[in-house]
Structures are given as structure tokens and as C-alpha cells.
UniProtKB/Swiss-Prot annotation:
Residues 371-426 form the HTH myb-type domain. The gene is mybJ. It comes from Dictyostelium discoideum (Social amoeba). InterPro entries: Homeodomain-like_sf, Myb_dom, Myb_dom_plants, Plant_Stress_Dev_TF, SANT/Myb, SANT_dom. Keywords: DNA-binding, Nucleus, Transcription, Transcription regulation. This is Myb-like protein J. CDD domains: SANT. Residues 164-173, 221-230, 258-372, 445-454, 489-543, 574-615 have a biased composition (Low complexity). Residues 131-142, 455-468 have a biased composition (Basic and acidic residues). Gene3D superfamilies: Homeodomain-like (1.10.10.60). Residues 399-422 bind DNA.
Amino acid sequence: MPNNQQNQIESPSKNTSNVGGSTLLNNNSPPFKSNGNLNSIPNGFNFLSSTSFHGGFGSLFSPDYAFNEQASSITSNSNLNILNNDSFDKNFGQSFFNSFSSLGSFNQTQQQKEALLSFQNSYLQQQQKDQQQKEQQKEQQKEQQQQEEQEQQQKEQQPNESNTTTTTTTTTTAVEQQGAEQQDTNLNSTSSPTMMTDVVFNTNDHVDFASANNNVMVTSSPISSSLNNSQDNTKPVSPDNIENTSNPMDTSSSNGKTPTITPIVTPITTPVVTPSSTPLSTPLSTPLSTPLSTPVAPIFNSPTTSTSSTHSNTSTPITVSIINNNNNNNSNSNNNNNNNNNNNNNNTNNTTTTTTTATTTSGGKTNPTGKKTSLKQGWTKEEHIRFLNGIQIHGKGAWKEIAQFVGTRTPTQIQSHAQKYYLRQKQETKNKRSIHDLSLQDLIDDNLNNSNKNNVDKNKQDDKEKKTQKTKKTKSKSSTKGDEEMITQQQQLQQQPQQQPQQKQPPTIITNFNTTPTSSQSSPKSNSPSSPSSPQSFQSSQTEQVVGKLFSPFYRANDGDDSNVRHIPKSFLNNNNSNNNNSNINGINNNNGNGNGNMDMNSNNINSFGNNEGNILRHQNSHQIPPPPPPPIQHVQYQMDFQRQYLPHHTPQPPPPPPIQQMAPIFPIYNGSNIHDINGNNHNNNNNNNNNINNGWIQSPININSQMQPQIHQQFPQNFYQYNPYSAPPPTLQ
């Protein structure tokens, strides 16, 4: 045992504070003493983030760390520093016992110290025993290989008997059970993480050790060795890790003991062929790039010994049982050479850390380049729940983050799944609504679709009539076909409903859902309002679109007569995705800039001001700038904008307002936006005093482009210097 560890365990602590009386051996000691004063422990010590906590983490594993019943009163005092002593300055990376010896600062007795010393000595002795056992195993393996080589040479000298057949049974199950028992015994002897990492278990070592003790020949074929190596992550598949044994047909032992034979899982008879001349390192030096569902017979044809010896050509049946504890779905290798085993060697339950091992794809096939082509089928419930949670966390559009959250889908798959999901959800909500809950827009869209179908059918009918008239003189067959098509189209037109919308009463639109043809609809060439030639139909279709937009539940505004339709403010519905991009008419969270009421049809923006100041400025501007001659409402800005945007044929476009020569109203402007907006540069600069220099506004020289200074000019209006913004630049401060 090292001397430094013994000195650390037997040396007393530098700190005089006795922390946590032992519940095991010293129950009479008080729970906490710090020179009789609890306030002597420094305040504000965050032991979770301190280096001393991570350095002396081993002391938390001690049995002396448990408090007795008297220590429950100490939890109320949050200033206690349990781990503030010198022993926690030890580094956790030295050894486990260096950090474990920090228990010397606690209230330890001589019995505890002796127990720790004996525990450490037993651990060191156990390590020496393990090393000796490993050396003995290696020596026994060498001796066994030499004996097997001699026996094989003797058998080669004997004459080949054609009718002799020997069967060998692999005892992998018994060997794995013995290996598991030895792992349990070794794990019970160790009680710390570092101890467990010192003792490394290899399944091949246990296989050879068991075979050496029981004198049982184990045929370590590439399949069984690779399956055993899949349990051990520390060893890659290489010829060094696969124990090369001798002739697999040999069941006789040198000592004459009978081998222990386990039940055969699946007996398969394969003829033994002479091994190929290629060395064993060529197929196994690389990671297992071909799946295990490849033909089995060539794998057994590969040499299983390091010596270049040839087997007999006699067909001897070999019974091989391949067992993988982590895979119950492994189909045993058969002589069908069938590559289409779906459940063949899909290592989904293996806890392997190397991702370069063979990954079988659909049908048990892999690309020759080694790239995995995962063909994933439908979405599971778990994936869909993770998809919905990812949307709630990251939001729509963050497909990469949601893909990382789901874990089994690519961002493109998640995007397509989201599109399908929202379309299906929209269709379900539309089907749930009754006809009374449908908005007027939906009803009008249905009617427009029907009228558009009628127009398209009528155009097709006219084209067919022209074609039939041209070809009637030359070809009679084509004319008869055209007449038949005309008759069928006329019958379709009679069955489809037609509607004459009421133009003067848009709130009370009555849709005609009659499917039976009427007398007025029987003549196909009558001047119906749905025909494209009449100007009334064009105007009616325009008014239908206008009425549909004005009377949708997101607008609720008509041509100016508020008596027909109840006016609902837009902020009541809180819809920020309307067709007009006018989120919240009342100026709340309005990020669209179109200052001083420029009545522009092409701009969907209303207001260039941020929060509630825009509401004030909008009404101020609408009072200052008189509206054009026939405005329906003179003080509501969005009504005027709606009429100019959606009703271009009702009201003429107003001329641009003349420049205002009077002062703007004096009140604080917080976002520095332009009231008059000379050039119309709508940069949407809301609540930002520094980015609107290019906004066509000659800004006040106070706090120009200074992001760190206090916003002094917010206390004053923009026209603090009493100047006309159209005449001259403001005076500069000296």
C-alpha cells in the first residue's frame, strides 16, 4: 500500500470543526460543532459550484456522512457549510482512495480507520489475484493450442475416412453463464466506480478460461465471436480479439475427460469445404461492414486456425448454435442462403457505442459503400407526441430543433408531417362546424367556385362548338362526337346550381343551393349573370369578392352604413394574420409603418408608430389632414384605407395632401418615427431611436446615432427647435 495514502488516512484534520457525528459508532457526539458558534462558518458558500465539492466528491460515499436524529434541526440553518474543510482540496482524478481518505476530517474512530485500511488492502490483493489469474489463463491457452496443433498434425497423417462423421456442439451458453457468474463475483468484490473500471471483463477471456478448465473445444467462428464481441464495447472486431482455435471437429480431450454438452439450439448440417487461401485478417480487420444475413456456408469455410492447415474434404455435419443474449429476434443461420430475413441481426437492443458496426436496413441489405439508407415507415404515437411537444417548445418553422427533439426524423420529414397535420386539423375543424357557424366568406367562396366552374364549362363548350363547325364539312364522325359532348356538358350545366347575387344588400346574401334545374336555367345560351360576356356579371363577381372580404369575421366593415352590420373592433378577435396585415386596429403591437395617412393602394401598412402612441398620432393626423371629398367616415383611418384598397371603383383616388406649413402637435414621440414621412421610406422602426436616419426624416441633433447615451430627447418633442421640417435643417448644437 502506498505510504501517502496511509498518512492521509491516519493524519488528523487541519480544521477543528467536527462535522456530522457518526451514526455508526459515535452516537453521543453532538451533530455539528464549530468552536461553539454556528456563525463561524462563512456565508454564501455554494458548494455545488465550488471546486472543493468536485475535488472531494469521494467523501459523499463514506458511511460517516450519514447524520443522526439530532441533525434534523440543522437543516433550518442554510448557512451551514458541510463540506468546507481542507480535505476537499484533494483532486478527484488522483485515485479513489485519495478522495476517500478525506474522511479523516470527519469524526472518525480508530476502528473506522482500521476498517478502511483493511478494505484498501483487500482491494489491492484482489487486483494482484486477478492479474495472476489472467496470466494463468494465457499460459493454459498456449498449452491447449500446442496440444491441439499436435493432435491435428497426427490426424492429418492418418488416412482420410470418407464415412466417418463427427459432430461438435458449441458450449457457448454454458461458457456465457460461467462468465456471467465470474462477473458477479468480481463485481461483489469491488465497491467503487474506479474499482469496477479497473476490472475489465472480456467474454472471450471467459470462454477460453472455461474451455481450459473443462477441456471443452469451443469453435470460435467469426459469427459467434462477433456476436460475443457485440456485448463487449471495449473490443472492436479484429483477428486479435477472436481466439483462433483448432479443428472444429475435435471433441476428444487430451486428458480423457468428457466434454460438457449443452442443448443444441438449431442443428444445421453444412459440408466442410477446404478453407480458402486468403488470410483471416482480410475479412475481419475492418469493422463488420457486411450484414450477418449473408450466406452462412462461406463463413464456416473461412479458416478458424492461424496455421495454414487443410481440413478433410469429407462432408461432416456441423451443429452450430449461435446465441446472442441481447437479440431474441436473431434468426439462426440456415443453409438457405436467404438474404431477405427481416428480423435478421437488427441490433436494436445492443448497447454498443461504436456506430461503425454493421447496420442492416430494410430487407437485411446494406449498400456496398457502407452508407445506411433508412426507409422509415409511418409515424408512431410517441414520435407524434414528441413532435407536438417540440412545436410547443421551439415553435413552427424550427424544423431542425424539432428534429433533434424527436430524434428519429429528419427536418424535411418533420416539415412534411407538420403540413399534413395542419391540413388535416383544418379540415377536421371545418367539418365540425355547422352551416350556421360558417362565415360569410366560406359561403361566398363556395358560390364563386360554382360560378367559376360554370364559366369554364361554358368556355369549353364554345370552343368545342367552333371546332365542330370547322370539321363538320369534312368529318362526320368528329361532329357526332362533338354533339354528344355538347349534350353531356349542357346536362351538367343544368344540374349545377346558378346564383344571382344581390348587390345592394351585401349583409343578407341568399345563396341558391337548389340542385334541380329550373325553367330559366334550361336554355344554355341565355344571358345568365354568370356568362363572361355581360358586364353585369363582371361587376357582380367583383362585388362578391369585396363583400366576402369586408364581411368576413376578421373585418366586419361595410361600405359605410353601420346600421346593417354590427361593428366589432379588430382587437377583439386578436387576429394578427389578416389579409390586410393590420394587426390590431387600436394600435397595440402594430408593427406596420405607413405614416401621415398616405392613402396608397399598394401599401398594406397603416401606422408607422409603435404601441399606443400610434393610435394618438393616427387620429391627430386624420384631424389635421382633411380627407377627400366623399369620405364615409372622417375620423376612422382604417375605414378610409379599406375603401381605397378593396373598393377602387366606388371612390376615386384622392390627390396627395399638400405639405403642412403648421407645427405638428407637441407631445412626446418615443420611437422617433416620421410623422410626415417625406420619401415614404417605411422601415418599420418601432421603439428604436437610432435606426431611422435613412427614413427621410431630418432628425434632431440630440443623441444622433448614440446607442449608449441616455435617451434625453424622449422628454422633448421632435420639433423642439421650432422649425419647419420641409424648409431647412435644424440648428446644430455647439
